[in-house]
């Protein structure tokens, strides 16, 4: 794929064009401990997503503002996509916290969740806890109004996590030391993107 030719819905130069297709870290003088998602981490990320999607779909999520969350009838089971993961890793490997603009593939308009955790103790936060922080945003979600009427910065990771029409996920991760802060940065890309237009998070049962 020539990523320099991909025109993203949100515009901008594609991450895999701008930074090249290497996933090697490009973090200036920060000390990189490791980068990439291990097989175990990949399975954990997928399991947390699918268990949670299943829980919400079955109407078993009692949290919310107000709760509970209504059940869903069209929730896809997520599968891992290596291309999404690769593009997520290229971005994570820049050690720049934030969303990259253009990360679409020829197959998908791509959505994204990011998380970072830093500690002065020489330990790196477990990937599962980073993902669960997105899940916990459900506590602020009001299902009686549309997701667009909710306060996006409080619920946007949750809505992408359970966006029914999303089919595939791929994540990248990097662990580095920045001024004695032991930092774990996780980027997950989703296709097709959630939090999109005037669509609903999921169809209610």
Swiss-Prot record:
Disulfide bonds join 4-17, 8-102, 27-95, 171-188. Residues 46-190 form the SCP domain. InterPro entries: Allrgn_V5/Tpx1_CS, CAP_dom, CAP_sf, CRISP-related, V5_allergen-like. Keywords: Allergen, Disulfide bond, Secreted. Expressed by the venom gland. Its main location: secreted. PROSITE patterns: CRISP_1 (PS01009), CRISP_2 (PS01010). GO terms for cellular component: extracellular region. The keyword Disulfide bond applies. The keyword GTP-binding does not apply. It is found in: Secreted. Belongs to the CRISP family. Venom allergen 5-like subfamily. This is Venom allergen 5. It comes from Vespula squamosa.
